[in-house]
Amino acid sequence: MNIYSVGLFYFFLVFIGAQAMDLDITDYQSIDNTVNIMMKDLMNYWNASSQAFVASYWWVTGATMGALLYNYELFNNDTYVDLISSSLLYNAGSGFDYQPSFEYFNLGNDDQGMWAAAAMDAAEANFSPPNSTEHSWLELTQAAFNRMSGRWDSSTCGGGLRWQAFAWLNGYSYKASVSNALLFQLSSRLARFTNESVYSDWANKIWDWTTDVGFVNTTTYAVYDGADTSTNCTTLDPSQWSYNIGIFMVGAAYMYNYTGETVWRERLDGLISHATSYFFTDDIAWDPQCEYFDDCNSDQTAFKGIFMQSFGNTIRLAPYTYDTLYPLIQTSAAAAAKQCCGGYSGTSCGIYWFWNNGTWDDNYGVQEQFSALQAVQMLMIEYAPEIATLASSTDNRSNSTYASNVVINDTNTTTTIVVKEKDRGGAGFLTFLSAIFILGASIWALVEDEEGKIPSRGKKGIAISS
């Protein structure tokens, strides 16, 4: 293909456009139709051989499994049952702990936590259990939890979980809110599911540490990004991201649902109050830390998907929050759907929902599709079934000590594709490669990251005031 042909192709791909999705946020059929279109565009990025989405980080596939499970629950859609099950098992690795060998030299505690959360989603959805000779979804979650909690580090900052899992990884010196938020959420979910005090004890321990160190401000309930161990966590990165507060919010909702304690309701209300004021503009969800500067990287475009799911989860666990959270789901879903009018399909979703004018922002990919999908799917949250517990589950296999002292011996050497963050020119090129893949080519396989995990945070020291 000559340069002229490539230029025409790319022009056609990017600017074909289409009228924004005609979503009626009050009509089930309209919501269902919109979700089906979004799902179709999302699955264009699926690669069955790697059991992951291309042109995205490994953790994004884990988070997206949660979205597919919500699709299964809310729309009774069994189309992707085998895909979900296969991906959750394959990516768990031979240790069944979401520490697979192909991610071992790139593993963040947040990555592992995202996959564990997806396995927990499966357990709580009473999702078809794995092969009877394997472990239950609960046991996979417990194994990952034990791996992560085993890395709790009291040698610096008085405790906490580091961002990266192992000392040789860039970012190991950083204690990140997201890693601790995920461990907190897993603790609270496991406490409710199993009714075992070891998990609620962990949830209280993590909450106390994150508030003591200042990651969660108990006056404003702002959630800051984290701090480095070189300063003993005394200098906070003031960046605020929607997914951090969303993950904490869900954990608090589980603890309130499980314990009924007033203190957890107060904490939940504080997080909701800050989340609904800081991360919305004209009642539309946004991440001002990067969207304000038009500078969102490939991690950050997925954050609102997790944030929107956190609203749905919170409503399920604390129904009194419905009147506060659901109207914001509605306005955000409507705006997200208006951004889904680009790319080759004419329905690819962008990320700048706050534009809210039916024009596309030229961004697309797995993360953008995931985020918009979660916003629209949460419109059906009031019809979600009750979240299961071990007592109501069809699979009662549980092992709270699994993988707590297991030596890793994972022989699976398949390499997952991780696209390294680039400058804007590089990002455009990767977008071009992704588009070619969608049309059936395989250029994506050549774009493997060889330098390891790239930090997902924005510029240090730059923060939007609360």
UniProtKB/Swiss-Prot annotation:
GO molecular function terms attached to this record: mannan endo-1,6-alpha-mannosidase activity
Keyword field contains Glycoprotein: yes
Name under which the protein is recorded: Putative mannan endo-1,6-alpha-mannosidase C1198.06c
Domain of life, per lineage: Eukaryota
GO biological process: carbohydrate catabolic process; fungal-type cell wall biogenesis; septum digestion after cytokinesis
Keyword Glycoprotein among UniProt keywords: yes
Signal peptide boundaries: 1-20
Family statement: Belongs to the glycosyl hydrolase 76 family.
